[in-house]
Amino acid sequence: MSSTATTKGGRGKPKASKSVSRSSKAGLQFPVGRIARFLKAGKYAERVGAGAPVYLSAVLEYLAAEVLELAGNAARDNKNNRIVPRHIQLAVRNDEELSKLLGSVTIANGGVLPNIHQTLLPKKVGKGKGEIGSASQEF
């Protein structure tokens, strides 16, 4: 028998193995090949290393997962099953690091964070025992 057992009768080319994407090799969901193409076409540098698009894909995937998790929590808090831009806005602005990263970003249809300044809130009227003998304004 010949060493090429994959071909019929030793004739023809051996079967080519199935191609594996760089995203699946790196265990990522974001497209490494597309990001590599964008890096090359964007003229950020004359040459782009082999690891750069993989690393950038991993960073983008992590950031997207972080925002989606927080936005999903915000949607669940509002008793919604669907994430809308308002939930993304609430998620980003309530997280200190993401708010700093996306500080100059405007999210369309995101609205604003609910905030009432402390001086505008009504004064608390206490009905406790300590206020009976209070002499703060007496002379």
Swiss-Prot record:
UniProt cross-references to SUPFAM superfamilies, sorted A to Z: Histone-fold
The protein's role, per its UniProt record: Variant histone H2A which replaces conventional H2A in a subset of nucleosomes. Nucleosomes wrap and compact DNA into chromatin, limiting DNA accessibility to the cellular machineries which require DNA as a template. Histones thereby play a central role in transcription regulation, DNA repair, DNA replication and chromosomal stability. DNA accessibility is regulated via a complex set of post-translational modifications of histones, also called histone code, and nucleosome remodeling.
Post-translational events: Phosphorylated on Ser-136 (to form gamma-H2AX) in response to DNA double strand breaks (DSBs) generated by exogenous genotoxic agents and by stalled replication forks, and may also occur during meiotic recombination events. Phosphorylation can extend up to several thousand nucleosomes from the actual site of the DSB and may mark the surrounding chromatin for recruitment of proteins required for DNA damage signaling and repair. Widespread phosphorylation may also serve to amplify the damage signal or aid repair of persistent lesions.
Keyword DNA-binding: yes
Gene Ontology terms for molecular function: DNA binding; protein heterodimerization activity; structural constituent of chromatin
Species: Cicer arietinum
GO CC entries: nucleosome; nucleus
Family statement drawn from the similarity comment of this UniProt entry: Belongs to the histone H2A family.
Short motif [ST]-Q motif, span: 136-137
KW Protein biosynthesis (keyword) present: no
Protein origin, superkingdom: Eukaryota
Compartment(s) where it occurs, according to its Swiss-Prot or TrEMBL record: Nucleus; Chromosome
Keywords, ordered alphabetically: Chromosome, DNA-binding, Nucleosome core, Nucleus, Phosphoprotein
Protein name in the entry: Histone H2AX
CDD domains: HFD_H2A
Region (Disordered) residue spans: 1-24
UniProt note: domains: The [ST]-Q motif constitutes a recognition sequence for kinases from the PI3/PI4-kinase family.
UniProt-listed SMART domains: H2A
Subunit structure: The nucleosome is a histone octamer containing two molecules each of H2A, H2B, H3 and H4 assembled in one H3-H4 heterotetramer and two H2A-H2B heterodimers. The octamer wraps approximately 147 bp of DNA. Interacts with numerous proteins required for DNA damage signaling and repair when phosphorylated on Ser-136.
Positions carrying Phosphoserine: S136
